[in-house]
Amino acid sequence: MARSIIAVLPAAGVGSRMQADKPKQYLTLLGKTLLEHTLDVMLSYPAVSKIILAVSKDDPYISTLSLDPKIQLVEGGTTRAESVLNGLNVIAEKNAWVLVHDAARPCLQHADIDKLLAIEDKQGAILAIPVTDTIKRADNQQCIVKTEDRSQLWQAMTPQFFPVDILRDALSTGIQQGANITDEASAIELAGFRPHLVAGRSDNLKVTRPEDLALAEFYLTRNKL
């Protein structure tokens, strides 16, 4: 049976580090919100059959957007893990795999999705890039304790790609155990799996701080040329 590919975008966060007057996914670049740019990437990828968008219950902005019929809204949770799980819980398709992607990563390119979808191992896979900067471990006073060996360190990105049933079980268990789930792979790891690392592009940045906006605008402009 051919697997179906569904995208889940958790978009219920407030993005406090952006210091903006609205959640960062609703900031505007090149005439569209960050969220719309990100949705466009998934909507234009032929293999994605549906997009599930998890938004805050009292989100005042989502109703102002013109959403494609392929997009299904679900109520987000208080954490990323809960929002993603809420999205997974409405998926009824058999043999479905899910691409979980940050709403504030608008510069994703289809070639990187291609590489993820080439993975058929049920351990799953995530986009990531090898760490190139020197990494320091700090103490509580923000002083350097040691320099870490970066030779086997990777920076996790999204999309992260897993069978729906495996990710659903892993997130449910992790949440029940009170685990620190910072991305989907961390829940999968706790369940005993070893997801593949797929080398992605460094321009697939997550807009987190004000200075990221100009860089995202540059990449989006370049990608449209």
From Swiss-Prot:
Q: Which GO terms describe its molecular function?
A: 2-C-methyl-D-erythritol 4-phosphate cytidylyltransferase activity
Tell me its EC number(s), please.
2.7.7.60
What does the protein in this record do? Catalyzes the formation of 4-diphosphocytidyl-2-C-methyl-D-erythritol from CTP and 2-C-methyl-D-erythritol 4-phosphate (MEP).
Reactions catalysed, semicolon-separated, are:
2-C-methyl-D-erythritol 4-phosphate + CTP + H(+) = 4-CDP-2-C-methyl-D-erythritol + diphosphate
- Reading the lineage from the top rank, the first entry is Bacteria
Protein name per its UniProtKB record:
2-C-methyl-D-erythritol 4-phosphate cytidylyltransferase
- Enumerate the residues marked as the site Transition state stabilizer: 17, 24
What processes does the entry annotate via GO biological process terms? Answer: isopentenyl diphosphate biosynthetic process, methylerythritol 4-phosphate pathway
Which SUPFAM superfamilies does this entry report, sorted A to Z?
A: Nucleotide-diphospho-sugar transferases (SSF53448)
Q: Where is the signal peptide?
A: none
- Would the keyword Signal be found if you checked this record's keyword annotation? no
Family stated for the protein in its record: Belongs to the IspD/TarI cytidylyltransferase family. IspD subfamily.
Q: Top EC class per UniProt?
A: transferase
Copy the pathway line from the protein's UniProt record: Isoprenoid biosynthesis; isopentenyl diphosphate biosynthesis via DXP pathway; isopentenyl diphosphate from 1-deoxy-D-xylulose 5-phosphate: step 2/6
The alphabetical list of record keywords is: Isoprene biosynthesis, Nucleotidyltransferase, Transferase
Q: Which CDD domains match?
A: CDP-ME_synthetase
Q: Site described as Positions MEP for the nucleophilic attack, positions? A: 150, 206
Gene3D superfamilies given in the database record: Spore Coat Polysaccharide Biosynthesis Protein SpsA, Chain A
